[in-house]
């Protein structure tokens, strides 16, 4: 994680965490992911290259009642090839096999056009503008406007 994307300032530009400065930052994140998985509160997966063991990124969902909130990060080297769109589609399909999940949502900074396009290609619909919604510390200490996206399970 550290070498693949954790320390990359461009990858971390729109996320809500600062780039990692040492391996122990990754150990803390992995520990938190494992605790959340055990508690059933969130599920995170690391994404690896098809033909090898190179880490490409990560994707996760956080459970909130009848819905899941989606988040993802991808190593810059793999931007623009559709890998994350594929991962999002797989995770959403998995989520909708859970009887209690009716909605998968995502929030994206209004300037993050790559994520906007990704979510729309994956079938998410923009629901609206969330004013001063999230602090992206690599951009500003002031909360920034974000778009809310969702995909609803067909009932």
Write out the residue ranges for each language-model feature:
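Short beta-turn/strand-loop junction motif enriched in small, turn-promoting residues
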Residues: 34-35, 135
């Amino acid at each position: 994680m550290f070498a693949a994307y954790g320390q990359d300032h461009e990858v971390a530009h729109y996320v809500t965490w600062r780039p990692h400065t040492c391996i122990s930052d990754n150990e803390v994140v992995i520990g938190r992911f494992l605790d959340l998985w055990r508690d059933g509160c969130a599920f995170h997966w690391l994404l690896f290259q098809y033909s090898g063991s190179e880490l490409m990124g990560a994707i996760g969902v956080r459970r909130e009642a009848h819905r899941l909130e989606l988040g993802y990060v991808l190593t810059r080297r793999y931007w623009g090839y559709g890998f994350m769109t594929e991962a999002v589609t797989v995770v959403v399909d998995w989520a909708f096999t859970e009887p209690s999940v009716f909605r998968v949502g995502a929030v994206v900074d209004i300037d993050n056009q790559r994520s906007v396009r990704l979510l729309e290609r994956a079938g998410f619909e923009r629901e609206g503008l969330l004013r001063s919604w999230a602090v992206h510390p690599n951009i500003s200490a002031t909360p920034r406007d974000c778009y809310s996206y969702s995909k609803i399970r067909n009932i």
